[in-house]
Amino acid sequence: MNKKIKIAVGVLLVSFCFGAGVLFASFYQPEEKTLQLYSNALKDFKNEEYQNSYYLFSKVGFLSKLKPYAIYHQAQCAKELGDKASEMKQYQLLFNAYRQNDLSIRAKYLAGQMLVDENPEQAAKYFKEIIKKHPSTDYAIASEYYSGIILLNEYKNKSVFPLSVKDDVEMAFRHYLEKAPQGRHALNAISNWLTLSKEISKDDYLLMANTSFLFEDYEKTKELLAYTDLKDSWVLDVKNSYALKNSSRARQLVQYGLKNYTQYVEEKDIYDAVNVYMNLSNSKKYDIDVLYDISSPKGKDYIWSLKCDAASAEYQVECYKKLYLNYPNSLYGANAMANLFFDRIKKRDYKNAVKIGKDYLNKFSSGNSAPMVMFWLGKVAERNNNYEEYMEYYKRTIAEFPDNYYAYRAYIALKHLKTTLLNASIKPQPVEYPYKNISKEDVIFKLAQLQDYNMLELTTDDEFVKSWIYYQKGEYSHSMLVARDAMEKLTPRPERSDLRWRLVYPIDYYDEILQYSGENDSTLMLALMREESYFNPNAQSSVGARGLMQLMPATAQEISSQYGFGMTSYDDLFKPELNIKIGNAYYSQLRNALDQLDISAIAAYNGGIGSVGRWKNNVKYSDTDEFVEQIPYMETKNYVKKVFRSYWNYLRIYIKE
């Protein structure tokens, strides 16, 4: 081999090695460097330094699990910079190179959105692929809308608009409204649909009217309802008339609908109509009787239950008996059975109480009243000195309904405690990511570690993870609501050490509670605050109660003046520390006036101290449990149970061992 050939070969080898090295470096990247690049890019994005953010995200290695998320961020940077070509390029790279990634569907959808006007044929192709391959996603629902828009735009200015194409446009809008009646494109779907020069069915007008109502456009709803069939639309017409303050029409429609058209609507719709009627009532007992007399069997169990609830004590039991016999398998039939069960307990007819209670648990083991029935079967067994039986019922209540108010009462009974509060305190723990067993290699863990919460929200369907994201973003009330609803769906409930519980029962403002609770139980005050405001310092009720502990301004002003707390305006109640200080002082006054009885004080915090005094004088009870069950004001009875349920759960989750 001569010298020139050797030199050429050497140059080629060096070039190859250099190129391979560059290629290797672009694919392989140390984890530490990847995280640093992503973190810095995210920081620049939040600081609106989009050019630099785009560049840093582009440097994330191709082999990194974070690469598709970096590409998506690049597209968002390009969007902020007004660079449509780069935005489209990144979306296409994402859904072509990372087809298995959840973001690929979103990327294709966003690309389709961008092309609706510029390249409708390509946009339609993208939307069609989404509908076909991912039919159960929100992106598929929105793609239906855009498919209709693209077809409409193609033909609306042509001399011939075939009826078959109009049918396709109509079908696209119909599917969208059926699946997303409150979707972001819903009102546009209606307005575009109405431009089609074709006959629209009564059912479709009802579909449009329902969406308009959900968007609180009551006049438009009224206009659309005029084209519907009353037998199908009477409930919506009732609700819309109520919203328009047309009380006479709303009442007339309820009566007419209950008499003639209940078979055409769902039971829950009948309940809504009845509730509107009762909201307009000046004589609830009379109006319940009117509705009861005219209603057909469907949905009558709800009206019957209202009739029983409003009946005098001497007629109530017979009313519940008839309700249960006529609707033995319905929700309200089950509630009637539970009321009959407790009536036997009040009358000390334990033999029949046990029979009814056992029948209830056999038929409705997961019914709303199952924890109450199970607990009271334990109380009856204890009163009958049946040790093994009452121990079994109390333990079952705790095991099957661990986070329920009756689990708390069962624990008190098991331990033979004479007090309402437990001799225990909590050790505050922070809200954490809700799953312990997540791998550090999991991309979800990496995104959480990088605090890329918006990206996490896009890539997860887990409600607890979403709750955690909202908490990290400072949306505490929203976080709790999402976690609470998610936990209600879990059967059985997870162990008390499960991190998901901390999202349902987070600890906020506890230092301030400790500082100002005085002789009040700090855990109980935490529970009260949770139920009053979900830790929203700016909460304001319809009657004017304000802040974390939902204090009425006049009451708060009186307490502040009495103790010299320095409240100068009602808006001061939105200041967390002052609200907690005044709220604890107020609760302490209630507690002192009610012989240090916390259940009575909690009832008074909601229903008023005068009401509690009257109830104690008028209700026959032998212990705390009988008193709570017989609080005549349903809101207060439920409030007491909610607060002590929260109290119990805070102790379960955070108890200081």
Q: Predicted regions span which residues?
A:
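Short, functionally critical alpha-helical segments immediately adjacent to catalytic or ligand/cofactor-binding
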Residues: 520-537, 580-584, 599-607, 643
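Acidic, polar-rich low-complexity tracts and alpha-helical solenoid repeat scaffolds
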Residues: 2-543, 549, 557-562, 568, ...
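Catalytic and binding regions of secreted/periplasmic enzymes and modules that target cell-wall glycans
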Residues: 589-618
